[in-house]
């Protein structure tokens, strides 16, 4: 008996080629839905201008999805896609419009016109910012991708569906470290920490200053250590990573992926090489609705240092696949919530623990990290066991058991 795949969905998010965490997660979910027969399209408020275009799955990644295409609609006038959700949704004849983004950016004048708006959103602050709560009022259903977010939504009276983010473990997997370092032009005889993330603001949300200060403490004790940054550097609003590294006297021990390559020529396969070149990923963000890099790195067999707040502790097994640094203080922000600033001393102490863990038994660390991700964050399992049942039930709710619309 053929599977029923009548539900049409539009997803407001980054284009799948945009090299962001959102674009990677959407790529991994939506092409699997296309493979399963679901009609989907993307309203790409980031990554596409001009007109609609069909975009194929990247040919150098998972060969299983070669030649599958997804229609991408371009950004219209509103910077975060509120107008596109409405107008592109009508053009695609979408039964439901999803978003994967920070919904505080969305315009309620468009949300109010969308009958079935379903945000799959990050909750990355406590309390939930009021501008997020206001937009949730327009949702037909609410979805979140962390247990932290699910619990906080419940405390605020919102029922939600929790489906965690996941990663493609056929792309992110262990490789030979020496070959990865050779490919990236990195020294072989160092204990290497890596940071991967956006550098959009100052103070930096990804915790760059705290991580650099922690690395200074670590490097003073272990001069054979080094650090690699995959970020973008050049803008007045960004945190001056290189300058701060030089200020602390670490310039000869810190390496950077080329800025242009970081922005435009980095895809999941090249980032997997970076994870495999390192020994430990540093990810002590000030706010985090999930933290995709943390599970990608562990899928490659690398332990991760996070901060003990928001979603981040959910992503590791403390003492086995990573460590959680403590918060130094919370900073009150204009959205009437808090960001958490990690203690550099605590990050350093976690670096010491991770160093000892890797040095003692690197093969066990690699195995433990990878199995944790395969068992809990494998995107194939999540699509099969979470997304397909959710969409099948939504299809019945909206179209009826026989395909006739209930609206």
Regions found by a protein language model. Name each.
Residues 148, 166:
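Carbohydrate-associated surface elements
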Residues 173-186:
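A short helix/loop element that forms part of the nucleotide-sugar donor recognition site in Leloir-type
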Residues 187-206, 212-215, 228-229:
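Conserved donor-binding/catalytic core segment of Leloir-type glycosyltransferases
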Residues 238-273:
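Nucleotide-activated donor-binding/catalytic signature segment of Leloir-type glycosyltransferases, i.e.
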Residues 286:
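Aromatic "clamp/platform" in nucleotide-sugar-dependent glycosyltransferases that forms part
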Residues 303-306, 316, 323-324:
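Short hydrophobic beta-strand element within catalytic cores of glycosyltransferases
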Residues 341-346, 359-391:
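A charged, aromatic-enriched C-terminal amphipathic alpha-helix characteristic of glycosyltransferases
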Residues 353, 379-407:
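C-terminal alpha-helical cap of glycosyltransferases
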């Amino acid at each position: 008996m053929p599977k029923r795949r009548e539900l049409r969905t539009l997803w407001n998010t980054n284009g799948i080629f945009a090299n962001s965490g959102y674009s990677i997660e959407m790529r991994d979910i939506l092409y699997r839905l296309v493979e399963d027969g679901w009609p989907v399209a993307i309203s790409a408020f980031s990554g596409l201008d001009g007109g609609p275009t069909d975009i194929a799955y990247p040919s150098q990644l998972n060969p299983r999805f070669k030649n599958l295409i997804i229609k991408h609609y371009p950004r219209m006038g509103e910077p975060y896609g509120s107008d596109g959700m409405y107008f592109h949704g009508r053009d695609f004849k979408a039964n439901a419009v999803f978003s994967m983004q920070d919904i505080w950016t969305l315009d309620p004048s468009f949300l109010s016109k969308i009958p079935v708006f379903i945000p799959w959103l990050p909750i990355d602050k406590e309390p939930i910012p009021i501008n997020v709560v206001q937009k949730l009022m327009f949702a037909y259903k609410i979805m979140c991708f962390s247990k932290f977010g699910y619990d906080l939504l419940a405390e605020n009276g919102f029922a939600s569906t929790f489906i965690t983010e996941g990663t493609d473990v056929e792309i992110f997997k262990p490789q030979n470290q020496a070959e990865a370092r050779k490919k990236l032009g990195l020294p072989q005889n160092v204990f290497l920490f890596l940071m991967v993330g956006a550098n959009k603001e100052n103070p930096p949300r990804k915790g760059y200053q705290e991580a650099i200060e922690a690395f200074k403490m670590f490097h003073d004790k272990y001069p054979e250590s080094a650090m690699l940054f995959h970020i973008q550097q050049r803008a007045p609003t960004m945190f001056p990573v290189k300058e701060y590294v030089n200020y602390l006297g670490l310039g000869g021990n810190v390496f950077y992926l080329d800025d242009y390559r970081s922005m435009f020529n980095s895809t999941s396969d090249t980032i997997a090489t970076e994870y495999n070149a390192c020994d430990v990923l540093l990810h002590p963000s000030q706010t985090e609705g999930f933290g995709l890099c943390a599970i990608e790195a562990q899928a490659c067999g690398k332990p991760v240092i996070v901060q003990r707040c928001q979603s981040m502790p959910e992503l590791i097994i403390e003492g086995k696949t990573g460590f959680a640094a403590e918060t130094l203080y919370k900073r009150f922000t204009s959205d009437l919530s808090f960001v958490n600033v990690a203690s550099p001393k605590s990050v350093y102490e976690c670096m010491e623990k991770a160093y000892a863990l890797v040095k003692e038994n690197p093969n066990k660390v690699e195995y433990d990290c990878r199995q944790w991700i395969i068992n809990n964050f494998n995107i194939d399992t999540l699509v099969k066991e979470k997304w397909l049942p959710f969409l099948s039930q939504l299809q019945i709710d909206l179209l009826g058991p026989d395909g006739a619309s209930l609206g």
